[in-house]
Amino acid sequence: MLTFGTAYVYEQKETGRVVSNCHKLPESNFNRRLLSVDEIVNEYTSLIAGMTARNPNLKILFTVSPIRHIRDGMHANQLSKSTLLLTIDRLQQLFPKQVFYFPAYEIVLDELRDYRFYADDMLHPSPLAVNYLWKCFSDSFFSAETKQVMTEVEDIRKDMAHKPFHPESEAYQRFLGQIVLKIERLIGKYPYLDFQKETELCHIRLNP
């Protein structure tokens, strides 16, 4: 899964190379510019072609971050996001069986317009928005079985986070035993799940 955030890049003036980090060097050492759709597509075409040659079954899911970059203003942000959306659309045309898109950007901007879906800075999604996006994502890509496994894993995670008032009590010891049984049942159905740390912690708490 790859998330595009911005189509703006920094280039070293001396070399013309795009940098991933300015390393606290003076801003005057760099040019900041908007990449074109063709530039991004060309880079990712060679990358995806190489990856799928090694793994023909590879599926790549793209998203565009709904967080707005307003340094250059709202219009420049829209130009950047539009460039990214057009890039992904082109990549889907080039790799229709390998490249897919999840519309996180559109969901936040078109469906979640209320203030409660944004943090105090009015740029970042609120926890409520994140949960909504996660539900949309899981409904789109997860099978019913996967959702059930996630529910059971989350149930165990919440149990493990429980902080007892009386850790030596018989009731808490039974509670720990129930967690171990839940883990054993889940591993019995899905042996690839790793609950070693949780199991060890339960046994430590059972035998202080």
Predicted feature descriptions by range:
Residues 12-37:
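A solvent-exposed, charged loop/short amphipathic helix patch at secondary-structure junctions
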Residues 23-32, 80-93, 124-126:
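Acidic, His- and aromatic-enriched active-site or binding-groove loops in soluble protein domains
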Residues 49-78, 111, 153-163:
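Active-site segments of SGNH/GDSL-like serine hydrolases
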Residues 2-16:
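Short, solvent-exposed beta-strand-terminating loops
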Residues 59-61, 82-114, 136, 150-152:
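Extracellular serine-dependent O-acyl
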Residues 120, 136-208:
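Conserved catalytic region of serine esterases and O-acyltransferases that act on ester linkages
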Residues 10, 41-60, 93-98:
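Secondary-structure boundary elements
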Residues 6-8, 66-68, 105-107:
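Active-site-proximal loop/turn and secondary-structure-junction residues that shape catalytic pockets
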